[in-house]
């Protein structure tokens, strides 16, 4: 599955080539996707090439060929924006302010004292991956796990947070927000396209995303590359 930014770039290249017969320049792609630098475009093109959607033609400048399009592509359609929570959509790098929690209901077929929150897809506890871009289903959680604010759930993929007691297949409960204190476990959006679950630290002016597994290195980013999308407030684990 493509991330939103990958799909935006693929469709932009495709539509531009239909209109003019030549691919857009890197500057045009950067501006179209509202990215801060061309390095982000290079990463997106490499990802699209690895997934078999485009290929670079050798010995020719700006030579790209679109091999295939997403199955759900509609000619002339633009990728949808404005999903909530912003971890799923990125909000073009402008995280959404937390909103008052909507009224929640106790599920008719579940235990008393429970509320339902949306499960918004998967989050990486490992190398960053894209979260699924829609509400996959709802989850019943104890109301005393939530507190104030807007909440959502994500299913964990990976093992980088095992020493914090977070395992592959767990479901994490996230309070939506765009700030964090050092030591908080957060959902972080990296380069406006990929989400990861890590412990938040500051290293001078930079942001460190710290794993809880010695097999993974702490990753350091400039402050403009990381957007906080919420803090961990609870965890649900199923035993089979």
Swiss-Prot record:
Q: Which InterPro entries match?
A: LexA, LexA-like, LexA/Signal_pep-like_sf, LexA_DNA-bd_dom, LexA_repressor, Peptidase_S24_LexA, Peptidase_S24_S26A/B/C, WH-like_DNA-bd_sf
Q: Which SUPFAM superfamilies does the UniProt record give?
A: LexA/Signal peptidase, Winged helix' DNA-binding domain
The Enzyme Commission number assigned here is: 3.4.21.88
GO biological process terms on file:
DNA repair; DNA replication; negative regulation of DNA-templated transcription; proteolysis; SOS response
| Keyword field contains DNA repair | yes
Q: Where is this site: Cleavage?
A: 125-126
Q: Which UniProt keywords apply?
A: Autocatalytic cleavage, DNA damage, DNA repair, DNA replication, DNA-binding, Hydrolase, Repressor, SOS response, Transcription, Transcription regulation
Instruction: Quote the protein name from its UniProt record.
Output: LexA repressor
């Amino acid at each position: 599955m493509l991330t939103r930014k990958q799909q935006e770039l693929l469709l932009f290249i495709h539509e531009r080539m239909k209109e003019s017969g030549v691919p857009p320049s890197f500057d045009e792609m950067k501006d179209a996707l509202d990215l801060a630098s061309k390095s982000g475009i290079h990463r997106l093109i490499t990802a699209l090439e690895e997934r078999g959607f485009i290929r670079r033609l050798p010995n020719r400048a700006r030579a790209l060929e679109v091999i295939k399009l997403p199955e759900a592509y509609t000619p002339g359609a633009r990728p949808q924006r404005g999903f909530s929570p912003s971890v799923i959509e990125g909000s073009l790098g402008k995280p959404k302010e937390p909103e008052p929690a909507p009224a929640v209901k106790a599920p008719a077929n579940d235990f008393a004292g429970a509320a339902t929150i949306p499960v918004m897809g998967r989050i990486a506890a490992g190398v960053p991956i894209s979260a699924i871009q829609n509400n996959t289903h709802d989850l019943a959680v104890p109301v005393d796990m939530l507190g104030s604010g807007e909440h959502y759930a994500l299913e964990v993929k990976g093992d980088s947070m095992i020493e914090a007691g977070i395992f592959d297949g767990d479901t994490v409960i996230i309070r939506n927000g765009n700030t964090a204190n050092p030591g908080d476990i957060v959902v972080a959006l990296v380069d406006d396209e990929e989400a990861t679950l890590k412990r938040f630290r500051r290293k001078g002016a930079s942001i460190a995303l710290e794993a809880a597994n010695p097999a993974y290195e702490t990753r350091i980013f400039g402050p403009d590359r990381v957007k906080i999308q919420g803090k961990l407030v609870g965890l649900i684990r199923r035993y089979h």
